[in-house]
UniProtKB/Swiss-Prot annotation:
Pfam families: Nore1-SARAH, RA
Name of the protein in question: Ras association domain-containing protein 4
Gene name of the encoded protein: RASSF4
Record keywords: Cell cycle, Phosphoprotein, Tumor suppressor
Range of residues in the leader sequence: none
Family annotation (CDD domains): RA_RASSF4, SARAH_RASSF4
Modified residues (Phosphoserine): S141
Matches recorded under SMART domains: RA
Length: 321
């Protein structure tokens, strides 16, 4: 079913399904009542007879493999003229301004590339790669009770090269040599979407938000139910509408970002057995085997009876000749 062929009283769920606008608005009202007083309430409007719903969509991380971050941001770097630099002693590193407030809050694994201006001393020749320590430095916000260590004295050129390819993820700095990151399984982030955005568009928006180098075709969105049932959202579906249809409570159903090749759909018939212990499942298997054996015996007896009837009929035909 194409969107152009839909009546104005219906809203598309996918390319082959739709829902009545009045029914969807009723579900939206329930959704907003559940999130009353919170930022997750959804707004709706109509444009040329088309219902558009927009707001924040929670997506949980369900990745098993690390994701690679982009080495450079899309934003243009700011180059300061050499006259603006004050003369410094060559044996001291460039100091970074410390945050005024030590407590920094972030929603989800926020990834921000850190760029510094290049000094005129580095523009005269090619930069050499500086060897990095395998351990990552922790920021002041992540370790409030850690004793502060005096930073090692570096040459200005070396310090500039280190800052140039550095990323910040929740206060942790990652160099481009180790710019891989695995979000905690089940941790939640959110993106602002609308009801006209397909699964592929939402994936692209989420990956761009965190500067993930991997393409959207390598990932998929799944609806994971409390029972263990897992359904993959097709590329033609609309995640925000799917969220409304499954209700506002994320304890019952959540949207997960998973790898396209590792995510597996779990139908309802299988999900109802997931939470049972192994001894109980073994007893189910034994019962099914017994039932299977009884069915085999019944079919065998039926086949033998039919075979005997056919043989008797053939003998009668031969005697008649």
């Amino acid at each position: 079913m194409k969107e152009d062929c839909l009546p104005s009283s219906h809203v598309p769920i996918s390319d082959s399904k739709s829902i009545q606008k009045s029914e969807l608005l009723g579900l939206l009202k329930t959704y907003n009542c559940y999130h009353e007083g919170k930022s997750f309430q959804l707004r709706h409007r109509e444009e040329e007879g088309t219902l558009i719903i927009e707001g924040l969509l929670n997506i949980a991380w369900g990745l098993r493999r690390p994701i690679r971050l982009q080495m450079q941001d899309d934003r243009e770097q700011v180059h300061l003229p050499s006259t603006s630099w004050m003369p410094r002693r060559p044996s001291c590193p460039l100091k970074e301004p410390s945050p005024q407030n030590g407590n920094i809050t972030a929603q989800g694994p926020s990834i921000q590339p850190v760029h510094k201006a290049e000094s005129s001393t580095d523009s005269s020749g090619p930069l050499e790669e500086a060897e990095e320590a395998p351990q990552l430095m922790r920021t002041k916000s992540d370790a409030s009770c850690m004793s502060q260590r005096r930073p090692k004295c570096r040459a200005p050129g070396e310090a500039q090269r280190i800052r140039r390819h550095r990323f910040s993820i929740n206060g942790h700095f990652y160099n481009h040599k180790t710019s891989v990151f695995t979000p905690a399984y089940g941790s939640v982030t959110n993106v602002r979407v609308n009801s006209t955005m397909t699964t592929l568009q939402v994936l692209t928006l989420l990956l761009n938000k965190f500067r993930v180098e991997d393409g959207p075709s390598e990932f998929a969105l799944y609806i994971v139910h409390e029972s263990g049932e897992r359904t993959k959202l097709k590329d033609c579906e609309y995640p925000l509408i799917s969220r409304i249809l499954h209700g506002p409570c994320e304890k019952i159903a959540r949207i997960f970002l998973m790898e396209a090749d590792l995510g597996v759909e779990v139908p309802h018939e299988v999900a109802q057995y997931i939470k049972f212990e192994m001894p109980v499942l073994d007893s189910f298997v034994e019962k099914l085997k017994e039932e299977e054996e009884r069915e085999i015996i019944k079919l065998t007896m039926k086949f033998q009876a039919l075979r005997l009837t056919m043989l008797q009929r053939l003998e009668q035909l031969v005697e008649a000749k």
